[in-house]
From Swiss-Prot:
HAMAP family: Arg_succ_lyase. It comes from Phocaeicola vulgatus (strain ATCC 8482 / DSM 1447 / JCM 5826 / CCUG 4940 / NBRC 14291 / NCTC 11154) (Bacteroides vulgatus). The gene is argH. Pathway: Amino-acid biosynthesis; L-arginine biosynthesis; L-arginine from L-ornithine and carbamoyl phosphate: step 3/3. GO terms for biological process: arginine biosynthetic process via ornithine; L-arginine biosynthetic process. It is found in: Cytoplasm. This is Argininosuccinate lyase. It catalyses: 2-(N(omega)-L-arginino)succinate = fumarate + L-arginine.
Length: 446
């Protein structure tokens, strides 16, 4: 078994080692590229304060770029007996460069190293999630505009209630995504602060230039207090998890609607054939499996904040190994959500709409409020109009022309989609991803 970075004269029990390392080696592959970027910024700073020579920095940067390239191509591995990505990178540098490779850990702990890895990984993933949300948003706005005049029943308590439209239905989920993106942006801003230099959570006697690493990595600012930087472990993941859960909640609800509306009892929409499956016994079946799985995965994602909170529950300040377990639920969540967003965008783009739903007289009573409002507009007291229409319904005498004239903001005839699009543009622009992208390109010399 390879020697641990922290190992002294007492050999480690292999069973205990397997238990304590757990799935860290598997999870740390998510962080490999980001560990290299953090190390590049750190050693550049070390050279500036005299802890590395210019020649040593040049050698280290060149080799770190090679390691980054292998991670980018999916070829980076953590060898048997090596407990984490930090140990693997340092081992590779030491094999290649000898004692120079052993210098990169000056002024650093694996505590702040994993903190910066997690933040670099998370902000990169948040950018990809934001892009997928924006793609789904544009599909929904386009469909809302296309079908703005197609009426459908609106429901309360799953009882037919009032006229709605596909313009409203698609647009409602688009605007929900705007709110979700605001949540995501807040999580990004909390994530985009530099913990590097906090070491084990109590700083360092080396004269570290934390402003320099903040700038090199493209962070907005830093976690200034070194104790708080470590306290932020788990808190950052929890905050991001709430944002992911918010998006997942929107997608799950939309998937439920689409599954229900595509059933024969509703018949409002038809899902793409390639997104349905058949039955082994019933030849007529077209089951909405893709959206059912999307709904289930999104419901699972909505539990993520609670999982993280329970792992960190009642921990005092400082680092604890409990926090390692968060990676197992947090790191894979991004891919799962992105896949759900991609499936949702595909289905909602190809979904077919029934444009004649309200021809069926079973939906006649959704126009009851329209009739009440018409009578009230002609001078009848609203409560009297309400009573008259109710009695007409009970007597089987209610009729209506199945037309609506709604003009106020956000209604059937005035969707305000242009304003919703403007809100989304403002939120997207507020992320300012270009700063982090430029910083990372500069570190890599690209």
């Amino acid at each position: 078994m390879a020697q641990k970075l922290w190992e002294k004269n007492v050999r480690v029990n292999e069973e205990i080692d397997r238990f304590t390392v757990g799935r860290d080696r598997e999870m740390d592959l998510y962080l490999a590229k980001h560990d290299v970027l953090g190390s590049m910024a750190h050693i550049t700073m070390l050279e500036s304060i005299g802890l590395l020579t210019a020649g040593e920095l040049e050698m280290l940067l060149a080799e770190l770029k090679n390691i980054y390239a292998s991670a980018e191509k999916g070829e980076f591995v953590i060898e048997d007996g090596i407990e984490d990505v930090h140990s693997q990178v340092e081992l590779m540098l030491t094999r290649k460069l000898g004692d120079v490779g052993k210098k990169i850990h000056s002024g650093r702990s694996r505590n702040d190293q994993v903190l910066v890895d997690l933040k670099l990984f998370t902000r990169a993933e948040l950018k990809e999630v934001a892009e997928e949300v924006e793609q789904l948003f544009h599909v929904l706005i386009s469909q809302s505009n296309t079908y703005k005049d197609v009426l459908m029943p609106g429901y309360t308590h799953l009882q037919i209630a009032m006229p709605s439209s596909f313009g409203l239905w698609f647009g409602a989920y688009a605007e929900s995504l705007v709110d979700d993106m605001m949540f995501l942006q807040a999580a990004f801003k909390m994530c985009n602060r530099n913990p590097l230099g906090s070491a084990a959570g109590y700083g360092s006697s080396f004269p570290l230039d934390r402003e320099m690493t903040t700038r090199l990595l493209g962070f907005d600012s830093m976690d200034y207090n070194v104790v708080y930087a470590q306290m932020g472990r788990g808190k950052m993941e929890r905050n991001v998890a709430f944002a992911l859960a918010s998006i997942a909640g929107t997608v799950s609800k939309m998937a439920f609607d689409a599954c229900m509306f595509s059933s024969q009892n509703f018949g409002f929409v038809k899902l793409p054939d390639e997104c349905t499956t058949g039955s082994s016994i019933m030849p007529h079946k077209k089951n909405p499996d893709v959206f059912e799985l999307t709904r289930a995965k999104c419901n699972k994602l909505q539990a993520l904040p609670q999982q993280i909170m329970m792992i960190m529950n009642n921990l005092p300040s400082g680092y604890f190994r409990d926090l390692q377990i968060i990676k197992e639920v947090f790191l894979p969540a991004f891919r799962e959500l992105k896949e759900c967003l991609q499936m949702a965008a595909y289905i909602m783009d190809k979904i077919k709409i029934n444009e004649h739903i309200l021809d069926d007289n079973r939906y006649l009573y959704i126009f009851s409020v329209e009739e009440v409002n018409r009578l009230a507009s002609e001078g009848m007291p609203f409560r009297d109009a309400y009573k008259k229409v109710g009695l007409d319904i009970e007597a089987g005498k209610f009729t209506h022309d199945k037309k609506v004239h709604h003009t106020h903001e956000g209604s059937i005839g005035n969707l305000c989609n242009d304003r919703i699009e403007s809100l989304m543009r403002q939120v997207v622009d507020g992320f300012n991803f270009s700063v982090m992208e430029q910083a990372e390109r500069s570190l890599l010399g690209r």
